[in-house]
Every structure is written in C-alpha cells, then in structure tokens.
Amino acid sequence: MSNRIVVVVTGITSGIAFADMLAVNTALPFIQRGFGVDAADAHWIAEIYLLFVASVMMTGGALADRWGTRTVLTVGMSLFTVSSLLCALSGSTGELIGARGLQGMSAALMAPASMALINASFPPGERGKAIGTWAAVSSLMIPFGPLIGGVAVDYATWHWIFFLNLPIGVVVLCLMRFVPVPAYENRHTRPIDWFGACLSILTLGALVFGLLEASRRGFSSVLVQLSFLAGGVSLVVFIFSQRVITHPMLPLQMLSRNRFMALSVMTLLLFGGFQSGLYFLPFLMAQGLGYSALESGAAGLPIALCVIAFSQLVGKKVDQLGPRVFLIAGPLCIAAGLAWLSRIEPHWHYFPEVGIGILAIAVGTGLVVTPLTALAVAALGPQNSGLASGINNSISRVGMLIGIAVMVVVLTGVFRSTLIDTMAMSELPAASRQAILENVAQLAELKWPQDLDSDRVALLSVARTVAFLQGIGQVMLLAATMVMCSVFLVPWASLRAREDQSR
C-alpha cells in the first residue's frame, strides 16, 4: 500500500507541473487580451515558468540528495500550491509573471525529487515497473492541461487554471504524511555547495533567457548575444569552482562516465527534436488547418494515452530485457511520425492524415519514456539520483528551447521566402510589399495592408497558409532528424554500470 502511495504522489507532482504549463499556453491569448498587454509581455507569463524550471532543476536535484527526497518534494508541492493561489489572485501582468516565476521554481524542486523518490523506494529489480507506473500516472494528468485551459477560457476565466491546482496540492500534501522513508535512499552528508548552486542557476538562466529571446529577436540581437556571453562566462567559473572546491555540487569526474555523457547528449537530441516538434503542433492545427483552440489542444491526447497504456508493460520488460531495444524502437517511431507530419498539406484532416503521424509519435513516446527515465536517474549512482534527475530534466528543457529557437528561425525563413515569391508574381506595390515583410514574424496571423484589392488579398491569403505549412514541414523534418540522431547514442547510453566504469 505504501509503495502505491509513493507512485501516486510522485506521479501527480510530476504531472501537475507539466499540465499547468500546457494549460497556461492554451489560455495565453485570452490572458493577453484580458490584461490588454502586448505579445512580448504575454509570452513572459509562460516563459518565466520555463526559465525557472530549467535553471533551478539541477540545484533542486542536488538538494534532494542532501536533504532527502520526501522533504524537498513536500517543500516543492507547498510552494507550488501557494504560488498557484498567487497566480489566480493576480491583478496585473507583473504580479502574474512574478507568481509564475515562483511556480516554476517550485516545479524545479518537485520534478527531480519525484523521480529520485521512486528510485529510492523500490529495489533495482522493480524500478522499471515502478517508473512505468509513475510515467502512467504523470501522463494521465498531462492531457488535462490543454483541455482545462480551453474549458476555463471558454466557460469561466483563466483564473480557474490556477484555482484548480489548490485542491490537488492539498490532497498531495496530506498523502505525503503516509509516504514511508525510502528504503534505498543513500542521502549524502557533504555540505551543500551554495556557490556552485548559484553559478549553475546563473549559467542555465542566462542561456535559457538567450534562447527564449532568440526565438523572437533572432541570434543577431545584442541582448541575446550578451545573455549567451554571460552564460558562457558563468559556466567557465562554475567548472573552475567545481574543480577546486572540497565538496562540489557536480563532481567533474562524473562527466567522464560514458553512460552519463551519452544519456545527456541523447536526451538533448531526443527532447530537442521531439518536444520542440510538438510545440508547433497546436499552431499547425489551429493556424494551418483551421481547427479550434480546444481541438488543437486535444490533438496530442493520443501521446499521453499511449504513455499510460505502454508504461507499465514497458517497465516490466525493461526489468527483464534491458532498455536497449526500447531506446532504439521509441525514437525511430517518433522520428517516423515527425517525418510524416513534414508532408503536411492544406487539405489534410486530423483523421486520418495528421492522426497517422500523431499515433507514431505516441507509440514511440510510450516506448522510450520509461527506460530513458530509469537510466537517467541511476546514471550517477544511488547517492546522486536527485542530481542525475535534475541534470537530465534541465537538459531536456534546454534541448527543447534550443530546438524551438532554431526551428522558429527555419519557419520564419521558409515563410518569408515563399511570400516573397508570391508577391513577385502578384506585382504588389513597393509600399505594400515592405509593410508585409516588416510584419512577416506574425506568420499565419499576418495581416494585409488596407490598400490591397480583394483578388490580391485572396491570393496572398492562400499563399500565407501554404507558406506557413511549408515552414512547419521543414520544422518537423528537422525535428525528425534530431530524434534519429539520438539513436546512435544508444550503445553507450545503455551501458551497464560495471561496463561504464571499466571504460
């Protein structure tokens, strides 16, 4: 019974953090309209959460190894509940952004602690099955994110996205009282490297901020380049500090382990392609194919359902057969689905055309999530499972941000070049052409100058949809390539601990 509570509690805490992010993304246009702010301010309501999650995650994992997974998970869930209330009561954009930052920080404590608690509560022979069940419980919550966001803005207000977190938080905190002391937790006693923790947050925060801004301003922006420079300098200082300090947060000898490095690069490529590709799925559905916000939000539902359906079975098989076959089959299915979506046409429907690609991605996700999670948590040994989980989670977020930043550049470039060709054929006046090119970053929401006649507007509107879908197609192809490349790391990522140490 106690082990079931562990799985339920960790699954809910991990799932609610991701579901809340998806719900806010769905409701973002309506939040923007409600506050009457520009797009840049509205985007930071969503992105400040991701910034804190990515930058604090590694520190959260290190704290779990030092203070205990139960303690850090309880603190994280408490902060998440309080910050959700602050979000719901926010009366301005600034208040909401601040509360969302606190919410992201709490999620950065919950995610690595939940994975490490699973690892510490079950014997090695049962961890695959336990992680599979954890993934199923966590994934069960994820599809509710876009649905709750859509229902809230359609039938109530966006505030209810955050109010609904409160009863969930209270229930989880009550259940935490019944979570036993983890039987396999090897909590270390070395002092916390606060200087290293601050440097890691600064490094990841600066790099993530640069990636977020690069998706809007481009990589040539001075602000973006300064962010990358600050992140690079702090990274050098962080590495130097970890070499000379007595009790470093990240002992650098860990980086020499083949399995850990291969897992890190594999995670970067897999999630950089997979999650950034899925980031554009609602845009494909809503702006490319004309589906409603609720329909677009529900488009990825099969992915969560497949993770739920496959996780326990895959977890059992991983314990019996090892992870290698799943680490190959999963990414291959995901890459095939993304490659299929790269062929998108304006006449496609969800059934069957888009659904074929989604189903392949869903099956691949169901196959790869459990073994990759199990390997990531165990990569640095039982005393560092929280740190390993935090690093793996941070890498997956950074990979997604790198993918999105690059893919926005690709999408905008393809969209722009296609529109230029169409404008050349339609012989637009120079002033109208310039006005369109100045606003090309609006992509499928691009508006036409008022002086154009109806025939030209009709021609350009068709060209806008075609150009947008061509850009999305290139994005999906790039995402598929990144996922495919991750497969080449499997021989090293799936090394056993003894093999890894002998190399």
Positions of PLM-derived features:
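12-transmembrane solute porter fold
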Residues: 7-26, 39, 45, 195, ...
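Extracellular/periplasmic helix-loop-helix junction of adjacent transmembrane segments
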Residues: 27-56, 95-98, 294-298
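Interfacial helix-cap and linker-helix signal at transmembrane-aqueous boundaries
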Residues: 31-32, 63-64, 148-156, 211, ...
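Central cavity-lining transmembrane alpha-helices of secondary-active solute carriers
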Residues: 47-61, 111, 115, 301-313
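Hydrophobic/small/kink-forming positions within alpha-helical transmembrane segments
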Residues: 54-55, 85, 140-143, 147, ...
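Helix-loop-helix hairpins in multi-pass membrane proteins, especially solute transporters
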Residues: 57-195, 222
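C-terminal membrane-cytosol helix-exit motif in multi-pass small-molecule transporters
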Residues: 166-185, 202-212, 230-244, 489-494
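Hydrophobic transmembrane architecture of multi-pass small-molecule transporters
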Residues: 397-491, 503
